[in-house]
Amino acid sequence: MASRKPMTAQAFLESRAADPAYQEMWLRKDAELAAFAAQFADEDRMISGEARALGYEISSVWDFVNNSPHSVLERNFVGPYEQAYPMLIRHLQIPHHRRIREGVIRALTVRDGREAVWQALLQEFNRETDNGLRWVLANALKIAMPYRQRVKFPEIARAYKSGGAL
């Protein structure tokens, strides 16, 4: 086996920048990602617009999910968003692209949502057929639903423990 000569990170990056096949691969990947995001961009804009009308400056439903301060990552939105819970509950009941639906569910994965939030999550959990989203809902219920209520529904624990692989 031939040994390779050590390469610095800078030299590696320069070699990738000069490699037309590598650059073509990244252009193709970027186009695929843009096409994927375009599938649900209108839905995300609709939710963001409704949130802005409530006073929350977000550009995506995922801004509610990733809303805690971070020392390195820049956050579009930081802070509580209780006034958005009713709007998010409404969107939970509207058919959305899977990526948006997951963002809505994760945005409702809150301890302070009270019964309105966990009842809506439970209703969707019982209705959901996608095992991956059932896991996301079970995770949300584990956070949002009081334990004394959650123990009445062993299927939540089963879905959570399955990791979405039921």
Model segments located where?
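Alpha-solenoid repeat junctions
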Residues: P69-Y81, L108-D112, L141-R148
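Residue-level detector of extended alpha-helical repeat arrays and alpha-solenoid scaffolds
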Residues: E57-V61, R101, R134, A165-L166
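Short inter-helical turns and helix N-cap capping residues of alpha-solenoid HEAT/ARM repeat scaffolds
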Residues: H96-H97, E128-D130, Y160-A165
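Hydrophobic core positions within HEAT/HEAT-like alpha-solenoid repeats
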Residues: V61-V65, I89, V104-I105, L122, ...
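N-terminal alpha-helical scaffold/docking segments in eukaryotic complex subunits
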Residues: M1-A84
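Amphipathic alpha-helical scaffolding segments comprising HEAT/armadillo-like alpha-solenoid repeats
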Residues: R4-Q10, A34-E50, G79-I94, G113-R127, ...
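Short secondary-structure capping micro-motifs at structural edges
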Residues: V61, V72-N76, M87-P95, I105-T109, ...
